[in-house]
């Protein structure tokens, strides 16, 4: 029944809205839930496209929350504020380019070789351990404590870490946050920059998946479009809450809890993968 597929879209939207921004891997959660909750009447090609395109709902939440800061044409902005906005966009572009270029050519290869329970589990655990290590080591005061002072070189270094997010289970936000922490960027600054960095990456990835879907001879029916819109709408609403939560959270807390969660989830996925293998 179509009503069940709408309900499934809502579940996917909730998961996307939460896991896209928290550094806990949206892929790790989607690959698990797909074994239990699936659309009965949709093709694998549609699901591959669906899982990426619903991210547009999440990224629209960033645009809405930070619209004034991201809009260089906002009335009333001083020349200095306009300049800062353009500089911010320039840093976002610099950081986005490495993953965009590599992803364009190797995304299918990464997905074919690493989109499985074991690979995702390993990346969840590895980055979980990285978060815990980074937070427990001796800390120097962050060199970058506001976004305006983020050097272009550091933005590029964060972008290079984002390439690692091509490995399913890494987490795009997780990779960029680790990159920022290693390069002396404060938690709040790297978290906010991660939000902005998602704008070109997610729009580009979604456009690419839609193009591939259509080029391979697939069509989108009204029902499929509706399911996409439902999931995107839910992801948008949930993201509005999660982004505000994470922004406040990192001002007072570190990322240790997310590291522990990743290790726990990775362990659960490894056990689940072993059980599946034993059961044939």
Swiss-Prot record:
Species of provenance: Streptococcus sanguinis (strain SK36)
Keywords for this protein: Antibiotic resistance, Cell membrane, Cell shape, Cell wall biogenesis/degradation, Hydrolase, Membrane, Peptidoglycan synthesis, Transmembrane, Transmembrane helix
Family the UniProt entry places it in: Belongs to the UppP family.
Protein name as catalogued: Undecaprenyl-diphosphatase
Biological processes, Gene Ontology terms: cell wall organization; peptidoglycan biosynthetic process; regulation of cell shape; response to antibiotic
Domain of life: Bacteria
Residues annotated as transmembrane: 2-22, 45-65, 86-106, 114-134, 147-167, 188-208, 223-243, 255-275
A GO cellular-component term linked to this record: plasma membrane
């Amino acid at each position: 029944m179509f009503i069940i597929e709408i309900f499934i879209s809502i579940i996917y939207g909730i998961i996307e809205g939460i896991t896209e921004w928290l550094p806990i891997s949206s892929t790790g959660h989607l690959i698990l839930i797909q074994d239990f909750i699936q659309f009965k009447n949709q093709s694998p090609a549609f699901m591959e496209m669906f899982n990426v395109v619903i991210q547009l709902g999440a990224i629209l939440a960033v645009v809405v929350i930070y619209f004034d800061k991201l809009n260089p044409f906002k009335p009333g902005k001083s020349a200095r504020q306009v300049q800062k906005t353009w500089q911010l966009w320039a840093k976002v572009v610099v950081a986005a380019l490495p993953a965009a270029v590599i992803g364009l050519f190797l995304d299918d290869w990464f997905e074919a070789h690493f989109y499985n329970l074991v690979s995702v589990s390993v990346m969840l655990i590895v980055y979980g351990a990285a978060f815990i290590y980074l937070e427990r080591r001796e800390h120097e005061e962050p060199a970058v404590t506001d976004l305006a002072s983020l050097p272009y070189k550091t933005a590029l270094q964060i972008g290079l870490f984002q390439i690692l997010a091509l490995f399913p289970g890494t987490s795009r936000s997780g990779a960029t946050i680790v990159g920022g922490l290693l390069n002396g960027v404060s938690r709040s600054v790297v978290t906010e920059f991660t939000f902005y960095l998602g704008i070109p990456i997610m729009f580009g990835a979604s456009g690419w998946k839609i193009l591939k879907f259509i080029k391979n001879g697939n069509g989108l029916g009204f029902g499929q479009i509706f399911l996409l819109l439902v999931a995107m709408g839910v992801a948008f609403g949930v993201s509005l809450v999660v982004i505000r939560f994470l922004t406040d959270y990192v001002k007072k807390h570190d990322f240790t809890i997310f590291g522990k969660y990743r290790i726990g989830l990775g362990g659960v996925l490894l056990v689940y993968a072993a059980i599946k293998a034993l059961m044939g």
